């Protein structure tokens, strides 16, 4: 995961210790909580909340 080749909208919140995979897009007003891991090439839509320590695989779309 350590790549910074992803997009996070300015209105989204990332807590400490999150992993974001390459090519992932996180859109408006989303919140990624501490310890969450998001795989590569994912799309997290508006207002998505990913709780603490949740793991999301590759190529997942959440709206």
Residue ranges and their predicted role:
Residues 2-9:
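Short gly/ser/thr-rich secondary-structure transition/capping motifs
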Residues 9-10, 15-16, 21-22, 27-28, ...:
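Left-handed beta-helix
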């Amino acid at each position: 995961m350590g790549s910074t080749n992803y997009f996070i909208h300015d209105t989204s919140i990332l807590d400490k210790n999150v992993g974001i995979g390459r090519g992932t897009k996180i859109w408006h007003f989303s919140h990624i909580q501490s310890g969450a891991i998001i795989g590569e090439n994912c799309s997290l839509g508006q207002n998505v909340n990913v709780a603490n320590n949740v793991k999301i695989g590759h190529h997942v779309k959440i709206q």
